[in-house]
Every structure is written in structure tokens, then in C-alpha cells.
Swiss-Prot record:
Zinc finger (C4-type): 4-25
CDD domains according to UniProt: Zn-ribbon_TFS (cd10511)
Matches recorded under Gene3D superfamilies: 2.20.25.10
GO cellular component: DNA-directed RNA polymerase complex
GO molecular function: DNA binding; DNA-directed RNA polymerase activity; zinc ion binding
InterPro entries: DNA-dir_RNA_pol-M_15_CS, Rpa12/Rpb9/Rpc10/TFS, TFS, Zn_ribbon_RPB9, Znf_TFIIS
Ranges in a coiled coil: none
Full protein name: Transcription factor S
Family named by the database record: Belongs to the archaeal RpoM/eukaryotic RPA12/RPB9/RPC11 RNA polymerase family.
GO terms under biological process: DNA-templated transcription; regulation of DNA-templated transcription
Function: Induces RNA cleavage activity in the RNA polymerase. In its presence, the cleavage activity of the RNA polymerase truncates the RNA back to position +15 in a stepwise manner by releasing mainly dinucleotides from the 3'-end of the nascent RNA. The truncated RNAs are able to continue elongation. Involved in transcriptional proofreading and fidelity. Misincorporation of nucleotides during elongation of transcription leads to arrested elongation complexes which are rescued by TFS-promoted removal of a dinucleotide from the 3'-end.
UniProt: Zn(2+) 2 binding residues: C71, C74, C99, C102
Keywords: DNA-binding, DNA-directed RNA polymerase, Metal-binding, Transcription, Transcription regulation, Zinc, Zinc-finger
Length: 110
């Protein structure tokens, strides 16, 4: 991150013109590809459709907390759990469970 020496606000890179630009006061400073590369991060937003479902990519579930709940598939009484906001912000979050024995995943709307 780079801050404007005039007003102290965050400066953003304009890669086409190869300058740092302050959107508050208009100050510009040359962009040095070698020196400034590690100060910039390209952010890419991934949008999901509501019907796509939730996929757990990280398989190291041993770091997740566990709770006593019966798995509807195998009857095991322990599951990993995590909470996510899957609906509108003014609605309660969704709790997901994954059985420690068979790996079945289900959800609970709180």
C-alpha cells in the first residue's frame, strides 16, 4: 500500500499510465515496476449464484470445532461445524455440519 504524501489518503496504481494516483487530492507519482510491484495486489471478485451451493475447498477439517449432533446419514454423534452468511444480511446465518465419520455435509438454518 502506498499513501499520498500531500493528504495521507491511499494511492491507487494506474497501470496504463504507470503512475500512482490519489483520488482525494489528485496527486500523482511515477510507478516503479520493480520497487512498487510488491505494494500492489490485484483483487478479483468472484460472484456466485444462490443455487450454486457451498463447496469446502480446504480439506484440513481438524482445525474446525466439533459438536455433538447426530449425522442423518450414518448416525454418528460428532460433526465438524462452521457458520456462513448465505442469505440476506438481515437474516440469520447458516450453520454447516460435516460428519467426522462418513463425511456427509448438511446445513441448519438458525
Amino acid at each position: 500500500m502506498k499513501f499520498c504524501p500531500k493528504c495521507g489518503n491511499l494511492m491507487l496504481p494506474d497501470r496504463k499510465r504507470k503512475v500512482w494516483v490519489c483520488r482525494s487530492c489528485g496527486y500523482e507519482e511515477p510507478f516503479d515496476e520493480e520497487k512498487d510491484r510488491e505494494k500492489t495486489v490485484i483483487k478479483q471478485e468472484v460472484k456466485h449464484k444462490p443455487d450454486e451451493g457451498i463447496v469446502v475447498i480446504e480439506q484440513d477439517l481438524k482445525t474446525l470445532p466439533t459438536t455433538k449432533i447426530t449425522c442423518p446419514k450414518c448416525g454418528n454423534d460428532t460433526a465438524y461445524w462452521w457458520e456462513m452468511q448465505t442469505r440476506a444480511g438481515d437474516e440469520p446465518s447458516t450453520i454447516f455440519y460435516k460428519c467426522t465419520k462418513c463425511g456427509h455435509t448438511w446445513r441448519s438454518y438458525e
